[in-house]
Design a protein with these regions (language model features):
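Bacterial N-terminal signal peptides
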Residues: 7-16
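Boundary at the C-terminal end of the N-terminal hydrophobic targeting segment
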Residues: 17-21
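A short beta-strand-turn-helix
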Residues: 22-40
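Short pre-active-site segment immediately N-terminal to redox-active cysteine/selenocysteine motifs
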Residues: 38-41, 45-49, 92
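Thiol-based oxidoreductase modules, predominantly thioredoxin-like and allied folds used
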Residues: 45, 64, 69-83
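Typically the conserved alpha-helix immediately C-terminal to a functionally engaged Cys/Sec
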Residues: 54-67
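Structural micro-motif
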Residues: 88-97
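Non-catalytic, surface beta->alpha helical segment in thiol-disulfide oxidoreductase systems
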Residues: 100-128
Length: 128
């Protein structure tokens, strides 16, 4: 069943991303590589049509710009790779997971994460 209003909302939110930027998505191989890169890493486990996930894209893009080469911020679409999502204990979309320089998970958040709260959590975890 198609819900026209929901479809229109997803399209409207997606259209706003092109103006505000987006964060690249990883495949399973890319996920493995990024977690061994010895850089701070933020992965949003979500999906391309999940409304809160789409809403997070401008926040993630702003964080990537703010941290530059000090951190890698990426998407991982659990809708495409359920096995890997299970391995990371992802139960809800979106879930943002922060990994330290060794690839160890240091914090996670479920749902939309406002930028100021996200920055505060990253600083508390050690990424400044």
């Amino acid at each position: 069943m198609f819900f026209p209003r929901l479809g229109a909302l997803v399209l409207a939110l997606s259209a706003g991303l092109s103006a505000q930027g987006h964060v690249p998505a990883l495949d399973p191989r890319g996920l493995s590589q990024i977690l061994t890169s010895k850089k701070w890493t933020v992965i949003e486990f979500g999906g391309p049509t999940c409304v809160p996930c789409v809403k997070m894209q401008p926040v993630l893009a702003e964080l990537q710009q703010a941290f530059g080469s000090r951190a890698q911020i990426r998407n991982f679409y659990v809708t495409h790779y359920a096995k890997e999502a299970q391995a990371h204990k992802i139960m809800v979309m979106p879930t943002q997971v922060v990994f330290d320089l060794t690839g160890k998970e240091v914090t996670r958040h479920i749902g939309y994460w406002p930028k100021d709260e996200f920055l505060s959590a990253l600083a508390k975890a050690g990424l400044k």
